[in-house]
Amino acid sequence: MGVLLCLTIHASALDREAFSFTRYDLDLTLDPGQQRLGVRGKITLRNDSDAPQRFVTLQISSSLHWASIQMADKSAEFVTQTYASDVDHTGGLSEAIVTLPKPLAPKDTVNLTVGYEGVIPQDTTRLTRVGVPANTAKDSDWDQISASFTGLRGIGYVVWYPIAAHAANMSDPSSLSETVGRWKRRERDAEMVASVAFLAASDRQRLFCGDVGLAALDKPAACLWRDLDANVPFFVVSAQELLAGPSADIFYLPEHKSGANDYAMALKQVEPSIAVWLGQHSSGEGTRARVIDLPYPDAAPFESGNTWLMPLTADETSLLLMAVQQSAKLNFLSPRPWISLGLQGYAQVRYIEQEKSRETAQAYLQSHREALIDAERSLPGSDPAMRSLINSTDEFYVRTKATNVWWMLRELVGETALTAALHNYKAEEDKDAMYMQRLIEAQSHRDLAWFFDDWVYRDRGLPDFRITSVFARAVVGGGYLVTVTAENLGGAAAEVPVILRMSTKDAVEKLVVPGKSKASVRILAGSTPIRAIVNDGSVPESDTRNNEYTIELNQ
């Protein structure tokens, strides 16, 4: 009863996200035969809140347990509990609540020595309990310690190092991504040093972690991660060979050699196009890509810094799109996630357009919009500034929305102006949020404040277009002058194409429709107008079922 009462008092006073972890110094021992992980080490935490803090929260995967926590070489006072959260593949965390001797002032730090251990088998609990099919869940949550392959990603997959975060729930489309995003933002300046010992390793197995490309396991190997926002701590133990390409080191399982060759060719194929569209912005130092093969053919890819974990047995299209994303990331460095993540997605869509068609590219865009639509629907009344592309911590949301923003920007200003602006971009000069807007305006000679206000600096949701009226008037000499009025029921303004279907051919005019407003456009029809359509798929909107209007001419 005393422990329960103590825990209740602690939990009521907890601010789980008050602290950032500024440094980890960990010793890891992995026993693949037992799927076991043992960790001893030191961590430094800083109070980043505005108030003194008496309690510190430490969380690890629920398949691990706390063995010891010390402060100043003395056992710390702490209690433990299971904390439900989907930031770990088990759907839960083993949480230790540490009582400090006295409240820690804002910006002050505390050093803790910790010990924890347990097993890490593959676990799909968090996914299957929300209805994800078992096979799909295994392809997503493939992390595990085993004799044949060991792969552990960090927060968001397996919490194998201590964190402190509010709960995330997979039933909420944005909960996990937002929680992980807030954590990563707090860890932007953090550093982790880890010594990894792998028991009973074969002669062919190697360790991949941090900046280590291919370390033997005959003795403990040192791993280093800096900037835990961009470089999520992970490690892989696997028997892999190396294919050193011009721009990437590709590590592959011996049976996947042909896939490694295919990926090397894919990188070579896409790099010239990326250079044309985005320019060359890499520093030339530390930007060489690294690819690590996964043994599961449908495993979900993962990226950390310049490293990609992915199955090299994927189909040709998937390999090409991964190569586009990787090349875009390495060749366009920006401190702003909406720029870097968005341009990676934009480059993929642009490549599909180049190799296939505009229709195929827009179909690809539309097929990936459902999550964006769901995310916007789930946040009515949220703070438009905090949910904006420049402030949101939800990486998936930022990537998805920013991809569409870049596609719309190309539609607005044209490829020539957009390409010139991107070539002129300098990351070191990007000191304020409006820098990119000014670059594009300088090349396009258009005022884009309305667009950036609604799509980048604030989240106004998505537009929702419908045609409210069409008036066709016969003109001398034949044909019709058709006036189309479109209404935007949503909050975000957009320049949208209005298509007039005729008995012989189509005509297209673009129209800017502000949020919660109407606008009209006149189109000269050379033959009988049949149907008016607003939006060809280039603009994301919340409802596309009301975009067509059948024209009835008065005879």
Question: Language-model features: where?
Answer:
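Juxtacatalytic substrate-recognition/specificity segment
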Residues: 239-339, 343, 347, 351, ...
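Beta-strand-rich binding/interaction modules
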Residues: 68-70, 205-209, 472-535
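N-terminal, polar/Ser/Thr-rich
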Residues: 4-5, 9-38, 67, 449-455
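A surface-exposed beta-strand-loop module
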Residues: 64-135, 140-141, 180-186, 517-527, ...
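Extended, low-hydrophobicity, Ser/Thr/Pro/Gly-biased non-transmembrane segments
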Residues: 113-232
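Acidic/His/Gly-enriched intrinsically disordered linker/tail segments
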Residues: 337-413
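Amphipathic alpha-helical substructures
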Residues: 282, 395-477
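Surface-exposed beta-strand/loop patches in extracellular or lumenal glycoproteins
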Residues: 44-64, 181-201, 490-499
